Amino acid sequence: DTMAEYLQGSFSKLKGLKVNMVATVKKDRIYNREANGNFQVVCTRWGPDYADPTTYLNLFLTGNQNNYGKYSNAKVDSLMKQVQAESDLNKRWDLMTQVEKTALDDLAYIPVFEKGAAALKAKNVKGLVHSAVGVPYTFKYVTIK
């Protein structure tokens, strides 16, 4: 895996740090290693389930089943309760920003890359709907002119 090799090479430049890579299939990584905490560092991914930052921020809640690193911070838990109750969008955004900053300051996660995608569409294709979350494209309304 190119990313794993790159990270191993980068980490090996840090004095005193030795990295032993373990390649595994997705099923083992998720259901054995991540679920049971059988790792020191793991490269994993998360994609949004819905169009709101909490799809990522909920991962930092104490006890969240997808919080594989068992990160726990009472401030984050408290802020997330406020996020869930806040109806003012600006205040909610400020609270979520505090959650993200706290988790980053704690090194709860280290973002390495962001998945992207590109697509080409002919000028005569109309009605193609792109979504940033869930199924990337909806073809229901496509017409060819």
Predicted features along the sequence, with ranges:
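Alpha-helix capping/termination and helix-coil
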Residues: 10-15, 38, 83, 87, ...
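Short, solvent-exposed loop/beta-turn-alpha elements that line the ligand-binding surface or hinge
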Residues: 32-37, 58-85, 114-145
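Bilobed "Venus flytrap"/periplasmic-binding protein-like clamshell domains
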Residues: 1-9
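Extracytoplasmic/periplasmic, Sec-exported soluble proteins
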Residues: 2-3, 22, 26, 45, ...
